[in-house]
Amino acid sequence: MNNPIRKRLSTEARCTQLLDVTRELILEHGLNSFTMELLARKAGVSNPLVYKYFSTRLVLLQSLLQREFDFFYGSLLTRLNQTDDFVAVVHIFVSINFDQESNGKILPILLNLADVAKVLGTVGPKAQNKVGNILVDSIMKAYGVTRKQARVMAKIASGTSIAAAENFSVVGGNREQTIDSAVQFILGGLETFKR
């Protein structure tokens, strides 16, 4: 029996591979079932190689959280900073909820672990507040409401968006049409708050 020849990867590529496999395993089997040994087996590498890159399970999970957080909030802020159009802002937020739902909910899983989440320090809450403030500021500008009212409106819009994304993940259908319908539903609801 021939053993497949393993390909030697660069340090960055191997680290990315291990983080990708970790993400897949957690989403598929749950965090409690995840072990470094399972990661090694599924990644097709030795246990010592996994520990060469990540000395502990905690370090691995923190690295995964940092990567996923940076990607998620980095891409979200980039997209939001490229538009002043309120409808486009709402569309971005709804699309992000659909992306999160279809790609799995790795961020909430990892953020719920205090020892893992501490890797973000104050950056995590600051990024979340910044994104939230962009939506609140956009609502204030578009509808001429107070900050307090805009926060309520943002919460309602967010709940609608999340519910639409969760429903789509179960029922399926045309993704873009469903996103557009959710955006129109949100905009219609927000209209009721106009002065």
Language model segments and positions:
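N-terminal intrinsically disordered/low-complexity leader segments
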Residues: 1-13, 194-195
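Short hydrophobic clusters on alpha-helical segments that form packing/core surfaces
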Residues: 14, 18-26, 68, 97
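Helix-turn-helix
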Residues: 17, 25-59, 63
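Solvent-exposed, amphipathic alpha-helical segments
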Residues: 21-28, 71, 75-82, 160-168
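Hydrophobic alpha-helical connector segments
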Residues: 63, 67, 77-103
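Amphipathic alpha-helical packing segments from all-alpha helical-bundle domains
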Residues: 70-74, 117-144, 151-155, 180
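Hydrophobic alpha-helical segments that form the core
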Residues: 96-99, 147-170, 174-189
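Amphipathic alpha-helical segments used for helix-helix packing
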Residues: 98-122, 166
